[in-house]
Amino acid sequence: EREQARIRREKVGFVFQIFHLVPRLTAAENIALPLTLAGVNHEEREQRVAEVLASLNLSDRAHHRPAQLSGGQRQRVAIARAVVTRPVLLLCDEPTGNLDHASGIDVINILEQLNAQGITLLLVTHDQELGNRANRIIHMLDGKVQP
C-alpha cells in the first residue's frame, strides 16, 4: 500500500472535471502544493512552478486566487498542478467538461503538447471532438468495455 501511494505521488498526475483548487491559495501556491507536500526545497519549487506557469501561459495569473480566474484558466492551473511533479502518466476525468468551446480547445492542445513531451494520457470524456483526437479509443457502455 505504501508503494502504491509512492507511485501515485511520484509518477501519476490527476486532472479533474471540477478543478479542486484551494480557494485561499494563489495559482502559484496551488501549483506548488504537491511539491511542498513532497518536501521539494523552496528554490526548486519556485523554479518548477515558474516553468509550468510559463508553459501554460499563466505567468500573469500567478498571484490570482481561483475566484479571480476564468474556467479555462482554472483548468490550466489544475493541469499545471498535475504536471509540476513531472509524472509519467496523467489521468484526466472530463478535462473539458466545464469549459466553453474555445477554452476546451486550448486544454486539448495543452494535453496534446504534454503527450508529445512523453507524458502518457488517459482521458475519460464524453466530448466527441476530444475523443477523435486520441491515439487509441476504448468505448464503455454501462461500465463495461465494448469490443
Residues covered by each model-derived region:
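ABC family nucleotide-binding domain
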Residues: E1-M140
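Conserved switch/coupling elements of ABC/ABC-like ATPase nucleotide-binding domains
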Residues: D142-P147
